[in-house]
C-alpha cells in the first residue's frame, strides 16, 4: 500500500506515485503477472477514495493493471456512494472481494456476509457487467486457533454460510 502524508499536498503525492505504478506495471508484464490494486479504507491510504488510483489505472488496459475491488472498504469509505466508485472502475475489476462489516462506535468490525453494512446489490451489479474473474470471499471476522478441531469446524460452517449468502447475491442479476 501507498500512504499519503496528510501534512503534504495530496495532488503532488498522487503524481509522485504515477512513475512507481508505471515501473510496477512494466515489471509485471516482463515476468508475466497482472498487478492488481486493492482499495483499502483509512484516512491516509492511497486508493481509499478509489478515484485517486483510478486516475492512474485508467491509463492502462485492464489486462495490464486492475482493481482487486473490495466492497467492504468501498462501503466504509463511501457509505452510500459506493455505487459511484463501482461504476467508475467496473471495467478495470480484476478480482472482486466480498466481506462485510458493522460499526461499533467509530470502529469497523468485520461480520458474516449479509449481517453488516455491505449492500447485496454489489453482487447483482457485478454480475450485470459480465464479470467473469476471480471472486474472493473473506471471513476476517473468524477468530481462534485453526489447529483446534472445534474451531476448524466453526470455520467450515462459517464458510458454508457465507458462501450461501454470496451465491444468493450473485444470482440476483
Regions found by a protein language model. Give the residues of each.
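Histidine-acidic metal/acid-base catalytic patches
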Residues: 50-69, 75-173
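Active-site acidic/histidine proton-transfer and metal-coordination neighborhood
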Residues: 1-67, 76, 156
Amino acid at each position: 500500500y501507498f500512504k499519503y502524508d496528510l501534512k503534504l499536498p495530496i495532488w503532488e503525492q498522487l503524481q509522485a506515485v504515477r512513475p512507481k505504478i508505471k515501473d510496477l506495471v512494466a515489471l509485471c508484464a516482463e515476468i508475466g503477472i497482472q498487478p492488481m490494486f486493492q482499495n483499502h479504507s483509512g484516512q491516509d491510504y492511497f486508493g481509499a477514495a478509489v478515484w485517486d488510483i483510478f486516475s492512474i489505472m485508467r491509463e492502462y488496459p485492464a489486462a495490464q493493471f486492475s482493481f482487486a475491488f473490495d466492497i467492504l472498504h468501498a462501503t466504509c469509505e463511501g457509505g452510500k456512494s459506493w455505487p459511484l466508485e463501482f461504476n467508475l472502475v467496473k471495467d478495470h475489476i480484476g478480482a472482486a472481494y466480498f466481506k462485510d462489516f458493522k460499526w461499533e462506535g467509530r470502529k469497523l468490525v468485520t461480520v458474516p456476509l449479509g449481517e453488516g453494512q455491505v449492500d447485496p446489490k454489489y453482487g447483482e451489479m457485478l454480475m450485470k457487467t459480465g464479470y467473469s474473474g476471480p471472486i474472493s470471499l473473506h471471513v476476517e471476522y473468524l477468530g481462534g486457533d485453526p489447529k483446534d478441531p472445534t474451531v476448524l469446524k466453526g470455520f467450515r460452517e462459517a464458510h458454508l454460510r457465507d458462501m450461501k449468502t454470496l451465491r444468493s447475491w450473485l444470482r440476483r442479476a
